[in-house]
A protein has these predicted regions:
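Carbohydrate-active catalytic/glycan-binding domains of CAZyme proteins
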Residues: 1-184
Length: 184
C-alpha cells in the first residue's frame, strides 16, 4: 500500500521576513499556487517563485529539475497546461504584461515565447476539446475573476475580458485575503 502526502513533500524555497507582529522573523513558503500536469507519462509540478519543476513517474518520488532562464521563474501562480504535443506555461506579474511559453520538452526546451497583451494574477488556461482556448484569472476579494477567449495560435484576446465571479466578503467572510483569512 502507498500513502501520499498532501502537501507533497518536496524541497522548496523559503522567504525570511521581519514579523510585523513581533521582533522576530516570519518564515513563509515560496512554493504556493502549484500547477500539476501529466505529460508524456510523467507528472510535473510548477510552483511560485521557484527555479525548478518537480518531476515524478509515480506521484511519490520527486526530482527537482532546473528550468531554462528565459522563463518567468520568479513570478507567482504559474499555470501549466497540456495541449496536444505542447505544454503551455505562464505566470503572474502584477502590473506587467505577462507572456506565454510553450514547449515539447519541459526539462530541455526550447521554450517558444508567445507575447502576451495584458497583465494578470493567478492565471488558468483552458484548452477546450473544440480547439478553443480560454483564459481565466484573478486573485482578490475586491476585483472579479476574469475570463476571455484567446486565439489558439497567437494567444491574443478575441474579445474583451469579462467579469465572471465577484467576491463578497460581507456575505462570505472566508473570501477575505491574507493570513487568518477566516476572520475580519
Amino acid at each position: 500500500m502507498k500513502y501520499y502526502c498532501n502537501p507533497i513533500n518536496v524541497p522548496y524555497r523559503y522567504q525570511f521576513n521581519a514579523d510585523p507582529r513581533s521582533t522576530g522573523i516570519q518564515v513563509d513558503r515560496e512554493a504556493a499556487d502549484p500547477s500539476m500536469i501529466c505529460f508524456k507519462g510523467k507528472y510535473y509540478i510548477f510552483a511560485s517563485m521557484n527555479l525548478s519543476v518537480w518531476v515524478s513517474e509515480d506521484l511519490v518520488n520527486w526530482e527537482s529539475h532546473r528550468l531554462p532562464e528565459n522563463l518567468p521563474l520568479y513570478d507567482y501562480a504559474p499555470d501549466a497546461r497540456v495541449n496536444g504535443d505542447y505544454v503551455y506555461f505562464c505566470a503572474s506579474k502584477k502590473g506587467e504584461v505577462c507572456d506565454y511559453y510553450r514547449t515539447k520538452d519541459i526539462i530541455n526546451g526550447p521554450y517558444e515565447k508567445i507575447e502576451g497583451t495584458f497583465d494578470f494574477w493567478d492565471p488558468n488556461l483552458f484548452f477546450d476539446e473544440d480547439g478553443r482556448v480560454y483564459f481565466y484569472g484573478g486573485c482578490s476579494n475586491e476585483t472579479p475573476v476574469w475570463g476571455v477567449e484567446l486565439d489558439p495560435i497567437t494567444m491574443k484576446p478575441l474579445g474583451e475580458r469579462i467579469p465572471l465571479i465577484s467576491g463578497n466578503p460581507f456575505e462570505r467572510g472566508y473570501e477575505r485575503m491574507g493570513v487568518d483569512n477566516s476572520i475580519f
